[in-house]
């Protein structure tokens, strides 16, 4: 299985000012596999330490954080010398030993020659709870479920993924049905590595759903195990409300759908907890096209998407029959899967920020507003071959952006003020 994050890791390895690297991401998106695969591809030796199951290593970091002493202890543990130039040190589940997190500062300052990558389940929460490590002493990389392009590669369609990157839309159009069929599979399977691997090996959608259910059960167990007791019920209710939130025509998050009379201040900490552990994407509203969009973010109005389109379908109870119902999967519960899919592909790009737009009267809504740093791109999402874009036209007439994008099942087309980008090519939005 190929992950494009490997390319980012190779750039990190070659960097002149390399710092210890922390890989963030939701549970089961493949952080451990990625670190080990990177070690296999780029180093002669890998030292893997799992702090969740290694009390000896926890004891090593419990006292002195002198880096020479720590390296000596690691060498004694693995039984050989550690070559700093060609050995990858992997610290997994590092949140279990806060002193190990703190040691990254000293490795950066006193022993930068060592190549260290770290990860951990719910690490985002540990970092936001004030675990000691100084800002500026580490690098970060966010890992998400497989993108649609990675899914194509995992399912033996590497050439189709390459064609998307080449942006030869005339040729892409000629293979449209293959892209649509793969996109249907991706909506159902999603990008969680275990689910994708199961699909590749068996093609059994029932087995895929069983894996997704197990992942969702593990997430709910994490709520009880790791969240503060007082907010666990609110996290669970909020999490379970997301499919119904996205099934609305207007997908703005409504607290009243969690329970009658629910208020924002009761659930703010629950949203932050889910966001910190990578389980939800919070997409805030803007009401203008000013640069940077972050300066105009309305934190009170937002949409909430989950980490993976396959998990959303599982949460919503979508059955395998939807795969056989023409292109019905794309429009199930008011196109929620399609908007989730587009959000998920956009969030894979760390160099863009994603928002949505409504005017102050609420009479005009654009599904996503993408800030690339150079451009503000409004994006309207259509689940079928619907080429109407009334709200996008209103936005265009008000702000006159350089580029307006409608993404749908229709072929690529430049039509005056608007570009139609096929849903299966939405990954290319940041390169337009």
Regions found by a protein language model. Name each.
Residues 1-15:
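Pre-Walker A adenine-sensing motif
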Residues 23:
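Hydrophobic anchor at the beta1->P-loop junction of P-loop NTPases
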Residues 31:
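Conserved lysine of the Walker
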Residues 34, 38:
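Hydrophobic positions on the alpha1 helix immediately C-terminal to the Walker A/P-loop
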Residues 53-85:
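Short glycine-rich substrate-engagement loop in P-loop NTPases that contacts/grips substrate
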Residues 90, 115-121, 142:
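Structural recognition of the conserved hydrophobic beta-strand(s) that form the central parallel beta-sheet
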Residues 128-247:
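Interdomain motor-coupling "hinge/lid" segment immediately C-terminal to the ATP-binding subdomain
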Residues 200-365, 369-371:
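Accessory nucleic acid-recognition modules appended to NTPase machines
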């Amino acid at each position: 299985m190929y992950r494009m994050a490997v390319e980012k890791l190779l750039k990190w390895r070659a960097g002149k000012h390399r710092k210890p690297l922390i890989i963030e991401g939701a549970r089961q998106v493949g952080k451990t596999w990625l670190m080990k695969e990177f070690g296999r591809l780029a180093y002669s030796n890998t030292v893997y330490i799992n702090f969740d199951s290694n009390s000896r290593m926890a004891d090593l970091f419990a006292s002195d954080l002198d880096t020479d002493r720590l390296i000596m202890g690691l060498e004694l543990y693995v039984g050989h010398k550690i070559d700093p130039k060609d050995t990858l040190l992997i610290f997994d589940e590092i949140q279990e030993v806060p002193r190990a997190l703190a040691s990254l500062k000293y490795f950066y300052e006193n022993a930068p020659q060592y190549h260290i990558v770290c990860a951990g389940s719910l690490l985002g929460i540990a970092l936001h709870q004030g675990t000691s490590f100084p800002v500026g002493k580490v690098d970060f990389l966010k890992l998400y479920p497989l993108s649609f392009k990675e899914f194509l590669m995992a399912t033996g369609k590497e050439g189709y993924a390459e064609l998307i990157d080449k942006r030869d839309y005339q040729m892409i159009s000629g293979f449209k049905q293959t892209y649509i069929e793969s996109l249907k599979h991706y909506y159902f399977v999603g990008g969680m590595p275990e689910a994708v691997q199961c699909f590749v090996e068996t093609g059994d959608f029932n087995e895929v759903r069983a894996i997704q259910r197990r992942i969702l059960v593990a997430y709910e167990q994490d709520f009880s195990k790791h969240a503060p007791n007082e907010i666990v019920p609110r996290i669970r209710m909020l999490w379970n409300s997301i499919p119904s939130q996205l099934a609305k025509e207007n997908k703005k998050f409504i607290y009243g759908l969690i329970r009658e009379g629910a208020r924002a201040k009761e659930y703010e900490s629950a949203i932050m907890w889910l966001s910190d552990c990578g389980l939800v994407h919070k997409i805030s509203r803007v009401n203008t096209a000013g640069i940077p969009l972050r300066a105009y973010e309305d934190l009170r109005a937002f949409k909430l998407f989950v980490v993976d389109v396959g998990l959303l379908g599982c949460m919503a109870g979508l059955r395998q029959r939807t795969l056989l119902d023409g292109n019905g999967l794309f429009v199930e519960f008011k196109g929620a899967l399609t908007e989730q899919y587009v959000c998920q592909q956009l969030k894979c790009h760390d160099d863009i920020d994603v928002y949505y737009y409504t005017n102050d009267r609420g009479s005009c809504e654009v599904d996503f507003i993408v800030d690339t740093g150079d451009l503000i791109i409004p994006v309207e999402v259509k689940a079928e071959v619907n080429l109407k874009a009334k709200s996008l036209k209103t936005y265009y007439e008000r702000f006159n952006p350089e580029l307006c994008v409608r993404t749908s099942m229709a072929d690529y087309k430049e039509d005056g003020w608007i570009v139609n980008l096929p849903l299966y090519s939405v990954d290319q939005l940041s390169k337009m």
